[in-house]
Amino acid sequence: MGQKVNPVGLRLGINRNWTSRWFPSARTAPSNIDEDNKIRKFLKKELYYAGVSEIVIERAAKKLRVTVVAARPGLIIGKKGVDIEKVKEGLKTLIKKEVSINIKEVKRPQADAQLAAENVATQLEKRVAFRRAMKKVMQAALKSGAKGIKVRVSGRLAGAEIARTEWYMEGRVPLHTLRAKIDYGFAEAMTVYGIIGVKVWIFKGEVLQKGIQFEKKEEAKEEREPRRSRRGRQ
């Protein structure tokens, strides 16, 4: 089960929270979902250079608040807040509502799954060898404190005639363990041979109900050598 489903959706309400936070009704739910989708597409396109990891949308009464979690928040805000005002005006024109925007910084960009997936996709678009791109991202994540990482790419790799899937994994990535804090990211690389999908799973430790991360002593002692596999199925 844990190997097949989205690890974020599987852990909602356990150690992950929803990115759209509002109370739906039969009348407003469809329009709200459509608005959320438009907001995310707009911000991803306009703020791609800032390394956007997550977009959280909150609604209360007639207020709409958007929190953008990014690796380079200074590029979003701009000099004296000029750039962020342009983004607000663009959102207001798009959805015909007043929007307040909060900016948060990603503490460890190298250990963020979404940014790692986009990094691999960007390198593939620049014609970097896919194995080199994958290993580079994995090494950076492990140096930033990740307990384990798995990267998978699918498509016409290196211009091959037949599409295939290849993946690497280092450390532990326990997808079945619900208390495990698994970060997940997905991106697509638009290459001359077609679209290549990139998926990244990063294990950041186990979380108790109070939010305390821990690592079992027995597991630390019996830690196995990092596993690597170039080809395989999830």
Curated annotation (Swiss-Prot):
GO BP terms: translation
Subunit (UniProt): Part of the 30S ribosomal subunit. Forms a tight complex with proteins S10 and S14.
Designated name of the protein: Small ribosomal subunit protein uS3
Gene: rpsC
NCBIfam families the record matches: rpsC_bact
Similarity section: Belongs to the universal ribosomal protein uS3 family.
Domain KH type-2 stretches: 39-107
GO molecular function, one term: mRNA binding
